[in-house]
Regions:
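Conserved acidic catalytic loop of the alpha/beta-hydrolase fold
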Residues: 1-17, 26-29, 36
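Short beta-strand/loop motif that positions the catalytic acidic residue
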Residues: 178, 184-186
């Protein structure tokens, strides 16, 4: 609704294509349902009409990491320092789900952070022994510097509660009511929104086609494989005179 208000304020009366991935893809579907008179086409990427139990479960683990950090203080941590350990761990869990086993194997393998160290010097409790561990810890602390823990909780819960059928009827009927041209884009190695879900979404929409990004980079591929995504989007827009 806020996006629609902004569009009206800017004098935008028609939208040629609403495109978005992940949470953005959920908003794409809502645009088509809430403002069909404005939207000419949609392109949801690696998303869902309703969050799967797999995604909900991963989000819950991340939220538990935050709320079990003593520094969370029931959400009232402002002025006292936010729950850095919990938010960092939540981010690390998320990073694992954004990529794939193939991408991690290719990037890190079993490489050690300090390859010059002798293996006989290792201890069971060694921290940051492997490069992948160091990478995850870095990504976790990087998010802590620029993101609010409570925002993480609410955004992840909003994704879990997302359900285009809520208040509208049964899912098949709701999806089929979207009549504008649609392009559903899946990612071959996405473990959050696997390709079978994307094909089902395309099948359920009234006038949709399906395309797939072939990549080892998991869910994040739509932020990495620009050439493939550009080719897919351009082809769809050309085919539909957009």
């Amino acid at each position: 609704r806020v996006q629609h208000v902004l569009a009206k304020h800017l004098g935008i009366r028609r939208v040629r294509a609403v495109i978005g991935g992940s949470l953005g893809g959920m908003q794409v579907l809502e645009w088509a349902l809430m403002y069909p008179e404005i939207v000419r086409s949609i392109m949801p990427i690696g998303t869902a009409a309703g969050h799967s139990p797999w995604c909900i479960g991963l989000n819950e683990i991340a939220r538990e990491a935050i709320t079990n950090d003593p520094d969370w203080r029931g959400g009232d941590y402002y002025g006292k320092g936010q729950p850095e350990r919990g938010l960092s761990l939540a981010r690390q869990v998320a990073m694992m789900s954004y990529r794939s086993d193939v991408s991690f194997l290719s990037r890190f393998g079993r490489d050690r952070r300090r390859p010059e160290e002798k293996r006989t010097e290792e201890r069971f409790d060694s921290a940051n022994l492997f490069q992948v561990e160091s990478y995850l810890h870095y990504q976790g602390m990087k998010l802590v510097q620029r993101f609010d823990a409570n925002s993480y909780l609410y955004i992840s819960r909003a994704m879990d509660l997302h359900d285009v059928a809520f208040g509208r009827g049964e899912m098949p009927g709701v999806l089929s009511s979207i009549r504008c041209p649609a392009l559903c884009i899946g990612i071959s190695s996405d473990i959050l929104y696997p390709v079978h879900e994307q094909r089902e979404l395309a099948k359920g929409l009234g006038a949709a086609t399906y395309a797939e990004i072939d990549s080892p980079h998991g869910h994040d591929a739509f932020l990495i494989e620009y050439d493939q995504l550009t080719r897919i989007v351009k082809g769809f827009m050309k085919d539909h005179g957009l």
